Amino acid sequence: MTGSIVKTEDISSISGRGDTSQSPEEVEESLRLIEDLKFFLATAPANWQENQVIRRYYLSNDEGFVSCVFWNNLYYITGTDIVRCCAYRMQKFGREIVERKKFEEGIFSDLRNLKCGIDATLEKPKSDLLAFLYKNMCLKTQKKQKVFFWFSVPHDRLFADALERDLKRSSTGSQPTTRAVSEPALSFRWEANSDVSLYDQITNHVDSQRTDSRPSTVGAQDVTQKQNNRVTDTPVSASKDVEPFESNVVEDEVQIVDNNKMCYGLPHSESNNYVPQQLIVPQSDLERNELTNEFDELNADLKPSDILTSNQEDDDFPLDYFPVEIEYSQTSMDSSLHMASQGAKHPSQMMFYEDMDGMMLGPKYPISAGIYEDPFFREEMAASNASKYMMPPPMSATRAHFMTNGEYYSKSREGKKHGKSGRQHGPDDGRRDYDNENVGSSPSENQNPNEELDATENNQDADDNRSPDIYPPTDAMANDEYIPAYNRRMQMSESLVHPYTGMMLNPYMFCNMLAVDPSLNMGVNPVVDPFYGQNHSMDVAHDVYSPQEVVYPSNYRSTPKAAYFNMRSPYGRNFPPPSAMNPYYTPYHRRQPSSATRRYFSKANLINRKSKSPPRKNVVSKPSHKAPKKVNRTRHATSMHVGLGGKDSGNTSSESRDDSTKEDSN
């Protein structure tokens, strides 16, 4: 090959006869470019960058680029690029495309054999993939079409079928889509009756053209004029001038020179003026080394002159430049904190890690050394805000969830007057009587008016004696569910639960500070699960409060779970009625919001039952469908009722006078 680099698409020129004449080097260059394209088609999906989406290969000015696209973890090639590859190979083979449209139709007809889902994917019009391919000039339109998988396209088979169609048209006298214009297509003879396939015949012919190429029959002047008129459009060909080809001149073979012996930047004549550097070793050092004989056996025959001619790999950065020393502590660990002798250890007693063999490190190691792992989480060591487990105030269906400001202040004033006398009533304190089964009747219907006023005053007293706060009384929490946090530890020692709280020790030493299982001495199971209300600052409380006689776990409950939560299990034999169980606070399924204006909704399981208490003032109540009965009362009866009642309030007497006045007027 010559020293000049020739552009691929400009290696041929058309003579007066219409045929193309090439030099053997140009034919070899064409075949090499075909091999380069085949290499790209085989290895394009390899060695991609992290965010790379497309990889291109330049064909020529006419064909442009062929692209490999990475989309949805798959590599694709378009039908347009497949046609470009076939056309490019046909031109480099030496056949010029005469009818481009008919040539493309033949290749697209062969591509119909590649089915969707197996060898290709069918994209919708103007999809994201088609839009990307169209922007990168891989497609001519964004219509609905197939995009082929990269390794599913048989490029060699498509090229051989296209060439076979043209050769058959030429043999039958039809107009072919391509015609032979240069080597190796001019010298190729197709044997249709041969057992060898067309592609194998092409391969054998190309191999023969590489080894025994025909000499050019064109004169030297024509070739010189051809190369001078050549248009160069690549950086390589533009940077170097193409030397004219001279016939009957055999060039000398190119000598391969080692890169290490080449002189860069200076001519050969000027490079001889410089003297290479030499390593100068003092004679005293050599004599001292010879006298002491401290050379190693492997380096005994090493001479200073060998350093200059040594391999470059030996001049790498030495690995022993930085001295590496491993220090092992010779001091024994402090064994003064042994809780048991080495011989007395039992496998059941070693509940902790045996990394330190049941010992702690001495004071010579600081805490910041981080020898021990932290067995605790930081959020578990944070002190809680409350030292006692307290349930939130239960939501009740027997009282309203909403309270106006007037009700709150009125209850506060009444509570100051009466004190806490309402606490001494029976268990039915604060509950109203719902024995009246007449849902639609008024409060005064079917009743004696004197009894109505008595019930009204009694209900008002019951409402006044009720405590306004919504928290349960103190005795309501005196059950096993509300055991304080300090009593839950029971007989557990402070040092066993939190060994680093009362001692000035490192918390990282907790795993290895005990050699004996603490549960053997305690007699109880420690509470290992965290619970609400546990406070590290209250660990000394067990010294003040004596432990209980019976030890309960943290999740112990004195009442059955079904009765506690009022949950009806489907596995029970009998279905208990709601009245059979009386939980000491309202269950979850009964915590329903009630109305602030219609107070009779506040009782659970009792709806639309009116209470006996009179309606509140300044509140508009819904009228009843039934007209109330008019009851004629005399002033004497009213005064007798007030005297028997025992409580003469200003509001009650004024209301009775107003009622009697209205009745007298009627």
Curated annotation (Swiss-Prot):
Gene Ontology, cellular component aspect: nucleus; Ste12p-Dig1p-Dig2p complex; Tec1p-Ste12p-Dig1p complex
A Pfam family hit: STE
Keyword Repeat annotated: no
One GO term (biological process): response to pheromone
Annotated Basic residues bias: 414-423, 623-638
Subcellular location(s) of the protein: Nucleus
UniProt cross-references to InterPro entries, sorted A to Z: Ste12, STE12_transcription_factor
Alphabetic keyword roster: Activator, DNA-binding, Nucleus, Pheromone response, Phosphoprotein, Transcription, Transcription regulation
Domain of life: Eukaryota
GO MF: DNA binding; DNA-binding transcription factor activity
Bias type Basic and acidic residues, positions: 425-435, 655-666
Annotated segments matching region Disordered: 1-25, 205-245, 409-477, 605-666
Description of post-translational modifications: Phosphorylated by the STE7 and STE11 kinases.
Keyword Repressor among UniProt keywords: no
Biased amino acid composition, Polar residues: 1-24, 214-237, 438-450
Residues annotated to bind DNA: 51-161
Function: Binds to the DNA sequence mediating pheromone induction (called the pheromone response element = PRE) which is found in the upstream control region of several a-, alpha- and haploid-specific genes. Involved in the mating process.
Entry's family note: Belongs to the STE12 transcription factor family.
Record protein name field: Protein STE12
Species per Swiss-Prot/TrEMBL record: Kluyveromyces lactis (strain ATCC 8585 / CBS 2359 / DSM 70799 / NBRC 1267 / NRRL Y-1140 / WM37) (Yeast)
Taxonomic lineage: Eukaryota, Fungi, Dikarya, Ascomycota, Saccharomycotina
